[in-house]
Amino acid sequence: MPNDDAYSKPSAPSEAPQTPGAPPQGKAGGGGGGSGSDSGASGTGAVSGKKSPRLPKCARCRNHGYASPLKGHKRFCMWRDCQCKKCNLIAERQRVMAAQVALRRQQAQEEELGISHPIPLPSTAELMVKRENSSGNPCLMIESSSSSQPPPASTPSTAAPGPEGRMVIQDIPAVTSRGHVENTPDLVSDSTYYSSFYQPSLFPYYNNLYNYPQYPMALAADSSSGDVGNPLGGSPVKNSLRSLPAPYVPGQTGNQWQMKNSENRHAVSSQYRMHSYYPPPSYLGQSMSQIFTFEDSASYSEAKASAFSPPSSQDSGLVSLPSSSPIGNESTKAVLDCESASEPSNFAVAPIIEEDE
């Protein structure tokens, strides 16, 4: 075709240095008479080092001897509907390339989603079949006998005699096309391993309270002190007795009394809860100073701060009193026996309330 040489790369003689006085048209490597000036222009561009970018040309026009740029030419090509041999070959090539581009785009999307992966080699397939056969999977009925041959590299399926003498054919790429089957037994673990990380909350109305081990303290009602009223039927106290540490509570020889009256729920101010050096308030009784008769005097401030820090405003009347105090003997009959266990357990508080005298 005469026009191909006009737009092709200049030949070896044209790349030689130009002799002085020689015309630029003489540097064309070949071509027709009408394209000599164009080839000479391309030769001078090659010598000067400034090559113009190659513009795509219409393939149908090139097949029929014309060179026309492809930009804006597709709708106006004279051989757009040509059915000659060369144009049919071009149309077939365009369809194949479009199908390859679509397939490549689909594979890229599936790899991003983790749906598909490349088909393994026959050696990997044989290893997977042997592993599944050793694990006793009934899906692949392959016996390791002398008559069974390993699958050849060209065929993707394996044939082995079954127990009844029939041939069982399994397609290996179909088995391995759903995720990484050979790595599945190593990656899947027991669900109980993950369930141990997430513990259900003991208190469904609070997000921060979980069943952490608490002090070994169990509180139960003691009926040996006389007249005991009816216990309150329902759930135990929302906030457990978190104020007193465990070593001091079983150290008391007497019973621990709980004063919780619905009429005497005083909200202790923040200064008595934050600062332990303030004296006890007068409205809580004169015998409040007897609470802090513990064995160790170093824990006085801790016990005093914990005694004056109720868990909430509803339980602000919950005060721990020794059995020798007159308030405990006269005004309340709720007896709570403090027992210490060797292992941590939750508090079980069962308050018993009798009306004020």
Curated annotation (Swiss-Prot):
Cellular compartments per GO CC: nucleus
Keywords assigned: Activator, Developmental protein, Differentiation, DNA-binding, Metal-binding, Nucleus, Phosphoprotein, Repressor, Sexual differentiation, Transcription, Transcription regulation, Tumor suppressor, Zinc
Ranges of compositional bias, category Gly residues: 27-37
Main location (coarse class): nucleus
Coiled-coil annotated residue ranges, if any: none
GO molecular function term, any single one: DNA-binding transcription factor activity, RNA polymerase II-specific
Biased composition (Low complexity): 38-50
Subcellular compartments: Nucleus
Location of Phosphoserine modifications: S323
Gene Ontology BP annotations: male germ cell proliferation; male sex determination; male sex differentiation; negative regulation of meiotic nuclear division; negative regulation of transcription by RNA polymerase II; positive regulation of mitotic nuclear division; positive regulation of transcription by RNA polymerase II; regulation of transcription by RNA polymerase II
Family stated for the protein in its record: Belongs to the DMRT family.
Function noted in UniProt: Transcription factor that plays a key role in male sex determination and differentiation by controlling testis development and male germ cell proliferation. Plays a central role in spermatogonia by inhibiting meiosis in undifferentiated spermatogonia and promoting mitosis, leading to spermatogonial development and allowing abundant and continuous production of sperm.
Entry protein name: Doublesex and mab-3 related transcription factor 1
Originating organism: Bos taurus (Bovine)
Lineage start: Eukaryota, Metazoa, Chordata, Craniata, Vertebrata
